[in-house]
């Protein structure tokens, strides 16, 4: 898991 400013469903 990365910390990004994106909308992802984890």
Swiss-Prot record:
**Where is the signal peptide, in residue numbers?**
none
Q: Where in the cell is it found?
A: Secreted; Bacterial flagellum
- The answer, when asked if Secreted is one of the entry's keywords, is yes
- Asked whether the UniProt record includes Secreted among its keywords, one would answer yes
Keywords assigned by UniProt?
A: Bacterial flagellum, Secreted
The record describes the protein's role as: Flagellin is the subunit protein which polymerizes to form the filaments of bacterial flagella.
* Family to which the UniProt record says this protein belongs: Belongs to the bacterial flagellin family.
Q: What is this protein called?
A: Flagellin
> Organism, per UniProt?
Bacillus cereus
Question: Which taxonomic lineage is given here?
Answer: Bacteria, Bacillati, Bacillota, Bacilli, Bacillales
């Amino acid at each position: 898991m990365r910390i990004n400013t994106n909308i992802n469903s984890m």
